[in-house]
């Protein structure tokens, strides 16, 4: 392991819904790549315990998706609360990237950041204020070069580690097929 200011921190959260005032984080995963998108390390993948009452607030899509993946059961039996998951994630990141230098990287990470700000503020503050949001490139490709979208198929497992691995691969695809140097 080698701390490097050019390494990138990738994150994905699974939540009980989309509203950070009402909904909660139920899974967190991170990984670190070098500047060329080579995966250097995968961080802890943690189900975050939430009460039965909180889980009962999920809409039909979230119940179906997170029950089908086994995440709801993992959340019910998880020993980790928000703070535990936050601290374990930060300890992992400290080995690879200094605080305050990596943008937050992933797909639709603005949404993830809203939840981090609310429930894991120390982790949110670990990131630089900038974003590397793969969904931005997808939206631009859809408008400017839609023919390339068919070349990358997402699995959409809605499991945090699978989703971030896929985000890294998707950015590498856009780098090769959309971004011209």
UniProtKB/Swiss-Prot annotation:
Active-site residues, Swiss-Prot/TrEMBL: 129
Task of the protein: 3'-to-5' exoribonuclease specific for small oligoribonucleotides.
Name of the protein in question: Oligoribonuclease
Keyword Phosphoprotein: no
Subcellular location: Cytoplasm
EC number from the UniProt entry: 3.1.15.-
GO CC, one annotated term: cytoplasm
Stored HAMAP family: Oligoribonuclease
Organism: Yersinia pseudotuberculosis serotype O:1b (strain IP 31758)
Swiss-Prot/TrEMBL keywords: Cytoplasm, Exonuclease, Hydrolase, Nuclease
Organism domain of life: Bacteria
BP GO annotations: DNA metabolic process
């Amino acid at each position: 392991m080698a701390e490097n200011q050019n390494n990138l921190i990738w994150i994905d959260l699974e939540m009980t819904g989309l509203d950070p005032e009402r909904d909660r984080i139920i899974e967190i995963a991170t990984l670190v790549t070098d500047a060329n998108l080579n995966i250097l390390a995968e961080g802890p993948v943690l189900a975050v315990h939430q009460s039965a009452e909180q889980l009962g607030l999920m809409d039909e899509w979230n119940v179906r998706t997170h029950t089908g993946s086994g995440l709801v059961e993992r959340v019910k039996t998880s020993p980790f609360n928000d703070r535990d998951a936050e601290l374990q994630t930060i300890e992992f990141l400290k080995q690879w990237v200094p605080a305050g230098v990596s943008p937050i990287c992933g797909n639709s990470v603005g949404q993830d950041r809203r939840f981090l700000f609310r429930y894991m503020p120390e982790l949110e503050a670990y990131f630089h204020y900038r974003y590397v949001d793969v969904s931005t490139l997808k939206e631009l490709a859809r408008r400017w070069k839609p023919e390339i979208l068919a070349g990358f198929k997402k699995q959409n497992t809605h499991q945090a580690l699978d989703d971030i691995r896929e985000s890294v691969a998707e950015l590498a695809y856009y780098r090769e097929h959309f971004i011209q140097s």
